[in-house]
Amino acid sequence: PTHALPAWVGALDLVLVLTDQTYAAEVSATIAEAVRRGARVIVVCPAGSPVAEQAQGRGTTILATQTGDQLAGAMIMLDGLSRIGLGPEVRPDRVAQALDEISQVCSPHQSVASNPAKDLAIALADELPLVWGGSVLAARASRRVAEAFREASGRPALAADAADLVAVIQAAAPRDPFADPFDEFGAVRCTTLVVLDDHRDDQAMARTPLLALAERHDVRVRTISHDQGNDIERYACLLQHGLFAATYLRLGLGSNLTR
């Protein structure tokens, strides 16, 4: 990725910057270039960070965070845009409440029978996950969840559009009912399709044939579903559920938690 501004950015534009303390010098240079061209700049970054200190000026508005979490930064930016009339209404308190509910359902204190994140982690223990989200935000969540699965297991995990997953599902290794589950060297890892479902109508057309294809090729399907609240709340809950599952997967596989 590049931090360079597009050539067309000028005095009539608003530049939005979400950053942690990574690439501070490059991000600061980009902000300075936007200000030099006369653009207004809104920056979401940790309070007291080098970016926050160097971005001070009349042409910039800094929304400080207390964490480097991407979702928290996005919520602050969306709330700020909503307050100045440049975006839909966002209720961070409702998002926080929804995430609290997911944390309770997926809590370590919940048994496997009542904890969907633990159940998903067990299902993926010896599998190669494909992650699909049909809506724009569910697809975004699927990419982050797949990344978390890769880090947790050290194995491939792919997030892609339905059309791109077709060939992967068709080429998936068939399940052998006589395979030795304890044969670490001879066993072929099978594929599981993880569907992130936010109950948006725009994903129904792609979802049905994708699930039918998975069934024909003996690819198991696991669903993370959330249908309450607005689009942002649903996105946050799908993501949090997936990240809980990735954490339990890492614990179950004995992976290095500091990685």
Task: Name each region found by the language model.
Residues A212-R259:
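Charge-biased C-terminal accessory regions appended to nucleic-acid-, cytoskeletal NTPase
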